[in-house]
Regions:
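Acidic low-complexity segments
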Residues: 1-16, 30-42, 82, 86-178, ...
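A generic local secondary-structure boundary/capping motif
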Residues: 21-23, 50-54, 127-131, 139-150, ...
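Translation machinery proteins
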Residues: 29-57, 61
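Short acidic, glycine/serine/threonine-rich loops at helix termini
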Residues: 42-47, 164-183, 199-205, 255-261, ...
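N-terminal cap/recognition module
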Residues: 50-95
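Short beta-strand elements
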Residues: 54-67, 178-207, 318-319, 393-400
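Residue-level structural signal for beta-strand termini and adjacent loop
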Residues: 76-78, 205, 329, 409-410
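Dual-mode signal for accessory low-complexity, basic/Gly-rich regions
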Residues: 150, 222, 262, 276-452
Length: 452
């Protein structure tokens, strides 16, 4: 047993290897099996009482087989011998019903992470249900105290604390069989501020990390949630115009996700990307770098290999604005005549940085002078082929580098190729949201759609 998990890594490797061995016995050309298991505790509190307290556990096995160029897959949540045999039979049968694909199949032998490094990601919290409940109650009480000290009508919303551990094992018919363990811990708080001239404002603050001790004091989340809610009271729309836009650090990863999705192998080989064929070309302002690091200790998107067994590498995705690489799994790499980059599951940890001056959040406001700070996205999206981007947003209007008033009921519109070329600064107010670490991002000109 590993942390909150009810199984251990060895048993997962055995189950994955057994599924592959049985599939090969049925005559398939190749097979791979991924087995996952995990568990944890999550606590939610509202109004000083527990709203939910859950101790959960899960396990699953997914099998993929290749036969005569055809691919079949099946999965189960039971790991007994009979269930594994049933999954093998189902995957084998499905492979006989689909069209062949010459580019499907296991990762190339030489690309597999046979004995490469696996980053440290496991850090069991050692927390009990009682200690997590106490932490959640403390977070809620501190949020309520901060709300009581704020001006106007403010109250604590739901708060939550969670701690979990996860295991994963991969086996393939090429002989690859490795496993890895990871932990994830979270805490977040919400606050609601009544606005006599409009709808109530709901804001939040959160922290997540592989290490429980790195979540920081609950007082920080409590205070930040209340301060954000109070600051957003009295929001109003503005007239449509063109102006600079500063994306707050916790929102900025949305722009990075839109960029990286255009560099996925599937988007590239199908030409369904606004960055089709972008390798080696300028795709962003020439002061920007985007770096990928799969081996960051305790990184939220770290890993020793993807679900095909291919290791990622520390590498530049963008260097001085130029595209240096795509995110490729084996199938998309073959279709492009390239080599897998170990990104069959998507990007590893990403870090956006700039060679241009940035600064604190206040310095970024001063650099913008007059424009819109975006603090929340409220609906919209982008066209992956054209790069057209539209979002309903809220935030703050700034003049002379100072916040004038909160802003609601506005939309932003632009084209992602133009937006990335018009980034003039990245702040030093860096935050990590999932796989992405970035500061605030300043775009020097965008279309703002408000009330006439």
């Amino acid at each position: 047993m590993t942390g909150f998990c009810t199984r251990d890594e060895a048993s997962l490797r055995d189950a994955a290897a057994a599924a592959v061995e049985q599939a090969r016995a049925l005559g398939v050309d190749a097979a791979s099996a991924t087995v996952r298991a995990g568990g944890g505790i999550s606590i939610k509190v509202r109004g000083g009482v527990a709203e939910s307290a859950v101790r959960d556990a899960y396990q699953s096995l997914s099998l993929t087989v290749y036969r005569d160029g055809r691919t079949g897959g099946a999965s189960t949540v039971a790991l007994d011998d009979a269930s594994i045999a049933r999954v093998v039979a189902e995957a084998h049968a499905i492979a006989g019903l689909v069209q062949p694909d010459a580019d499907a199949g296991l990762a190339n032998f030489e690309t597999l992470a046979w004995d490469g490094p696996a980053p440290e990601m496991f850090a069991h919290s050692g927390q009990s249900p009682e200690s997590l409940m106490a932490r959640a109650l403390e977070l809620e009480a501190l949020t309520a105290d901060a709300a009581a000290q704020a001006s106007g009508s403010v109250r604590a919303g739901e708060v939550a604390v969670g701690s979990s551990d996860h295991l994963s094992a991969l086996a393939t018919s090429a002989g690859f069989c490795r496993s890895i363990a990871a932990s994830t811990h979270t805490q977040w708080a919400t606050a609601l501020a009544d606005d006599p001239n409009g709808p109530s404002v709901r804001e939040y603050a959160q922290a997540s990390d592989r290490r429980f001790d790195a979540l920081g004091p609950v007082s920080a989340q409590a205070r930040q949630a209340v301060e954000r809610a109070v600051a957003q009271r009295g929001g109003r729309s503005i007239a449509g115009r063109r102006a600079p836009v500063l994306f707050e650090a916790r929102i900025a990863p949305t722009l990075i996700h839109a960029l990286t999705q255009a560099l996925f192998g599937q988007a590239q080989h199908s030409r369904a990307s606004w960055l089709a064929g972008a390798l080696g070309t300028e795709i962003a302002a020439d002061h920007l770098d985007l770096f990928e690091d799969p081996l960051e200790p305790f990184g939220m998107a770290s890993g020793g290999w993807d679900h095909e067994g291919v290791a990622g590498s520390r590498r530049a995705i963008i260097a001085r604005g130029r595209c240096q690489g795509y995110f490729l799994g084996s199938r998309s790499a073959r279709k492009l005549g390239m080599r897998s980059t170990g990104n069959a599951d998507g990007p590893w940890n990403l870090i956006l940085s700039s060679h241009a001056p940035g600064g604190t959040a206040a310095a970024m406001r001063q650099a913008m002078d007059t424009g819109l700070i975006v603090t929340q996205l409220q609906g919209g999206g982008s066209d992956p082929v054209t790069g057209n981007w539209t979002q309903a947003v809220s935030g703050f209007w700034v003049e002379g580098g100072e916040i004038v008033h909160p802003v609601i009921d506005v939309t932003l519109g632009g084209r992602l190729p133009d937006m990335w070329r018009r980034v003039v600064a990245v702040g030093e107010d860096r935050e990590r949201q999932g796989a992405v670490r970035t500061g605030s991002i300043l775009v020097d000109d965008m279309q703002i759609g408000g009330r006439a």
